[in-house]
Amino acid sequence: MNDQVIIFDTTLRDGEQALSASLTVKEKLQIAYALERLGVDVIEAGFPISSPGDFESVQTIAKHIKNSRVCALSRAVAKDIDAAAEALKVADQFRIHTFLATSTIHVQDKLRRSYDDVLEMAVNAVKHARNYTDDVEFSCEDAGRTPIDNLCRMVEAAIDAGASTINIPDTVGYTVPSEFGGIIQTLFNRVPNIDKAIISVHCHDDLGMSVANSIAAVQAGARQIEGTINGIGERAGNCSLEEIAMIIKTRQELLGVSTGIKHEEIHRTSKLVSQLCNMPIQSNKAVVGANAFSHSSGIHQDGMLKNKNTYEIMTPESIGLKNQALNLTSRSGRAAVKSHMDSMGYKEDEYNLDALYADFLKLADRKGQVFDYDLEALMHFSNLREEDDFYKLNYLSVQSGSVMATTSIKMQCGDAEMCEAAVGNGPVDALYQCIYRVTGYEIVLDKFDLTAKGEGEDGLGQADIIANYKGRKYHGTGVSTDIVEASGQALLHVINSIHRADTIAEMKQKKIATV
């Protein structure tokens, strides 16, 4: 049996169905290019009959994508298939994907036909699609709940009609891995012409089983997996293709199969899809979550410093990420703190590790995560406290109109108090202009997030920012019942960290000058 698993991406079709707003044609093409770079074999670009916009998207992608096969979905209806073919005809290589429900509940309650009628519809659809291309995929919708005898009949008939790929969807995410793998195995055992088609699976995540079910299907003989980037899709989503790719790569000795995925493109593709679809990635999501390669436990960090394989079964670099530093939290040990000091170039005789670690724990208990610039400040200034910040916001007033906003502030700058006012595109922008003028710092914001803490009118808002200043990243957080004030606190958190770093740099320079 062929050991190459075909990766079929349906982010632009099934994945887009989960979005509150449709992607533009330009955005879909961006994602299609990313999928092509990733090495996806088949890109399902849309459902042409559903709308003029979808037709245009499929046609545009079909025209521009050269290294992946472009596919379009159609119901088992001649006009749908005709529309798919019309949209796809500009492609170098294309596939028509037609589908029909096969489960008892769908046949009786949705289609309201006999199973023999449904069988005939499927055969006619496949034959009609074959008039346009030899690459025809037929899907048995809700196959996971279809009586096995009926499913075997449908698969055999569709292959006889000319389908080159047979897709077995667990449409409502109902099955468990042993059960779904058993369905695939039964098809291989009982369908006489099964060797004339590739068996594909399309699993949904309603019970959190989509990836496991897909892997079970591969072990039973399936050689195409359908899914989406980041697992986006209707209801609980689809099978996550980045997880599939890394499972097959990481456990290749067990599974005995491979894919054509360029794994180093995974992170880049995942981030693009998240941004364009406005769907944040869960921090603890496998493979691409922000915490996927983070280690905060002291025991884990000690193991990682001795041998990364103790707690990492795959590397950040394998998905296109730079090597991730150990997160410093109150659970981190001395070894992790020393490792960070070493990475910044400090020698052991330049600081007292025990004293630094004691101060580090106090700071970590207050702020959660500690960064390299915090450690450096602790080394020079010992016990850091918020009341020691050079810049503080004493007063804030905001006036917002329909177009622009005006903000007035009073700030403590060491021993002096300064006033400033500014107009901006919204109250936060105006506040930031004030702070930049007072402090003299103007930084580049890489990330700005606002989240609610609690409910109701007295709930807190939290602002989190990541800023770039002279090539170094700084993190800031602010919490207040007023989101504008919280945003200001977050920026001042960053600017005070930068001010301390600049002070340390000056101290180092003076030390060098006196040597």
Swiss-Prot record:
Primary localisation category: cytoplasm
SMART domains per record: LeuA_dimer (SM00917)
Cofactor(s) demanded: Mn(2+)
Region ranges (Regulatory domain): 392-515
Pathway: Amino-acid biosynthesis; L-leucine biosynthesis; L-leucine from 3-methyl-2-oxobutanoate: step 1/4
Gene Ontology cellular-component annotations: cytosol
EC code: 2.3.3.13
Subcellular compartments: Cytoplasm
GO MF term list: 2-isopropylmalate synthase activity; acetyl-CoA C-acetyltransferase activity; manganese ion binding
UniProt-annotated binding residues for Mn(2+): 14, 202, 204, 238
Domain of life: Bacteria
Any Pfam family the entry gives: LeuA_dimer
Keyword presence, Protein biosynthesis: no
Cytoplasm listed as a keyword: yes
Keywords, ordered alphabetically: Amino-acid biosynthesis, Branched-chain amino acid biosynthesis, Cytoplasm, Leucine biosynthesis, Manganese, Metal-binding, Transferase
Catalysed reactions, as listed in the record: 3-methyl-2-oxobutanoate + acetyl-CoA + H2O = (2S)-2-isopropylmalate + CoA + H(+)
GO BP, one annotated term: L-leucine biosynthetic process
Domain Pyruvate carboxyltransferase: start-end pairs: 5-267
Stated family: Belongs to the alpha-IPM synthase/homocitrate synthase family. LeuA type 1 subfamily.
Subunit structure of this chain's protein: Homodimer.
Record HAMAP family: LeuA_type1 (MF_01025)
Protein name: 2-isopropylmalate synthase
Organism: Vibrio parahaemolyticus serotype O3:K6 (strain RIMD 2210633)
